[in-house]
Amino acid sequence: MQLPIPLFPATLIRRYKRFLADFELESGEIVTAHCPNSGSMKGCATPGSPAFLSRSDKPERKLKYTWELVKADGCWIGINTGLPNRLVREAIENGLVAELQGYQTIRPEVRYGENSRIDLLLCNADQLCYVEVKNVTLVEGNAVLFPDAATTRGQKHLRELMGVVRQGHRAVNFFVVQRADGEFVAPADLIDPEYGRLLRQAAANGVEILAYRAHVAPEGINITGKLSVRM
């Protein structure tokens, strides 16, 4: 998946109010960018970190720049949570996710459950597969952890997926790891113990838990391979 062109190299000054971040461009200009990530971004928002921004000149945009990538622990990390759904869809369509082949159509953002929208609904003549996509950026030691902040929304999604299984459909919680380090994915129990409990409950009740790594670079982001999940 190609990132917006061109990207602008920048240095992070600070992130604040969740959706705002200040950067210094190579020219020395200081700009405020939209931060498309509602999590804590633990380990990914250290002042002085190299970053890449995209730019939109649409007149309705209040902030022209969007934060796309940050460099931490020696690797580029994709922090834009608006991209993983498209990334996973492209990977499925290109045959890169063996577990999700054989479906005739893929529909994005379909309403289901209690006022929820599933990220991807895979359909064929005799089966529906509900896929919830989660962007993962936190690494501690060898573990890639989710979530990086308590998430009642994520908890709700797991309950909704269990409901889908009870209705006789297939349900998948799909972790996308947008960084090169870390050896396995695990729930961040110290950050959100209820999410960890629900993830284990979901797995025990038929929800499939998948994790794939993405190669992240200014040239683009692509799914590269499967990671193990440790409960």
From Swiss-Prot:
Top-level division of the source organism's lineage: Bacteria
Disulfide bonds listed in the record: none
GO molecular function terms noted in the UniProt entry: DNA binding
One matching Pfam family: SfsA
Matching CDD domains: SfsA-like_bacterial
UniProt similarity note: Belongs to the SfsA family.
Protein name per its UniProtKB record: Sugar fermentation stimulation protein homolog
Organism the protein comes from: Geotalea uraniireducens (strain Rf4)
